[in-house]
Amino acid sequence: MNRKDKYYIRAKRENYRSRASYKIIEINNKYNIVSRGDNVLEFGSSPGGWTQVIENITQSVIIAVDINRMDPVKNTVFIKMNIFDDDIFKSIDHAMAENNIKNFDSILSDAMSRTSGIEDRDHYNSYKICERVMDISIPRLKNGGNIILKQFQGDMTNEFIKKWSGYFNYYKITKPKASRQHSREIYIIFLNRI
């Protein structure tokens, strides 16, 4: 982590766990993905930068999933699990039942595998994560709900969008200012589940 990075410095000053907090702040300010009272499912939650922002907005239950541990965040049920684990469906459904959640208003994914520096491999891995997130999410997202996913842009991005955009009224691609400029990282936003 570059300790001279302005978002890193700002995150430390404002008590956010990561510079990624500013990505979700910017995206939500622009697209109004989450609102007060929303129930949210979050993938790739550790260390909790997005979770802090989401909880501050929704002041409602968040179910957060990550393969890495995460320190507690208010109103958050944390599931430490790999999203490719067969039990992920059961674990999420159990957490939903325990918290009287029928469907989610919004589902957010900042999940990413470790990068290799090989662009095609990193893109493919991010594509597979996004596919898995969508497989988990579509049956659990309410009509009118929204999804955000991080992906390394590449030759399968258009195919991914074409496959899933039919479930929504519209989609957007964005790259927040807090994303590193040289990164191929983008956020795909699917809005208003049909």
From Swiss-Prot:
GO terms for molecular function: rRNA (uridine-2'-O-)-methyltransferase activity. Signal peptide: none annotated. The active site is at K150 (proton acceptor). Transmembrane segments: none annotated. It comes from the Archaea. S-adenosyl-L-methionine binds at G48, W50, D66, N82, D110. The keyword Cytoplasm applies. Its EC number is 2.1.1.166. Keywords: Cytoplasm, Methyltransferase, rRNA processing, S-adenosyl-L-methionine, Transferase. It catalyses: uridine(2552) in 23S rRNA + S-adenosyl-L-methionine = 2'-O-methyluridine(2552) in 23S rRNA + S-adenosyl-L-homocysteine + H(+). GO terms for cellular component: cytoplasm. It is found in: Cytoplasm. Specifically methylates the uridine in position 2552 of 23S rRNA at the 2'-O position of the ribose in the fully assembled 50S ribosomal subunit. Belongs to the class I-like SAM-binding methyltransferase superfamily. RNA methyltransferase RlmE family. This is Ribosomal RNA large subunit methyltransferase E. The lineage of its organism: Archaea, Methanobacteriati, Thermoplasmatota, Thermoplasmata, Thermoplasmatales. The gene is rlmE.
